[in-house]
Amino acid sequence: MISIKGLSYSYFERQALEDVSLEVQAGEFLGLIGPNGSGKSTLLKCLCGILPPRRGEILLEGKPLKDYSRRGVAQRVAMVPQDSTFGLNFTAYEVVLLGRTPYLERMQLERTSDHEAVQKAMERTDCWDLKERRIWEISGGERQRVVIARALAQAPRVLLLDEPTAHLDIAHQAEVYELLGSLNRQEGLTILAVSHDLNLASEYCTRLALMEKGRIKAVGGKKDILVPGLLNEVYKQEVFVQASPVTGEPHVFLVPKRK
């Protein structure tokens, strides 16, 4: 689905990505983990065409990403940023309708098929009942479901999410990841999600990529990546890892630096 080969990107003098290579298979749920500033968000921005890589190549379905038009990329890859800003008077329906922009010509009005796609996306994310509510008056968890619905309205093959549960309480965190897991399992949607919550990533992702200082440190199964030695080295923090008594997936616990 996605092949990243020797990708590098820099913000002026600061190297954000350095020689990143990664294969993402169709239908997998890949979690991107790593410390702040390790390049996770920059990698997502390169994958959706927002940032052009300085070196290296990204292949989407076997074709160089740079050979797609902006519309072509948007019809295949949807991005859910960490923070989304909308006009205060937008309804939830109007926000999701923005996801149909890649399929419309300039000044073209939305067609019946576009409205059908919006309803389907909102029903899939269980936010159809919010369609007439203003985006500013709904809760954080509800707003995140609306933003994900907007991405799904693009009918993408790949969904990218940058910390989709940031600023949410544990109930809404679980709600968002249950939704993503369902989209991945039942519909085969390929998902790449940046997460600072290692335990949520462990429970819902099928594979993990650990980043450090702009590079891919390790890629593999959750039980191969979420191990004390590797996490201690990358995060510079002692951790304890134990299988969840409920699911058996590895869970990471902070070891306090108490004297």
Regions found by a protein language model. Give the residues of each.
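The feature captures the beta-strand-to-loop junction immediately N-terminal to the Walker
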Residues: I33-P35
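Conserved ABC ATPase signature
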Residues: R134-I138, E142
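Conserved ABC ATPase "signature" region
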Residues: L97, T112-L130
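Catalytic Walker B motif of ABC-type/P-loop ATPase nucleotide-binding domains
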Residues: L159-E163
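Conserved catalytic motifs of ABC-family nucleotide-binding domains
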Residues: A155
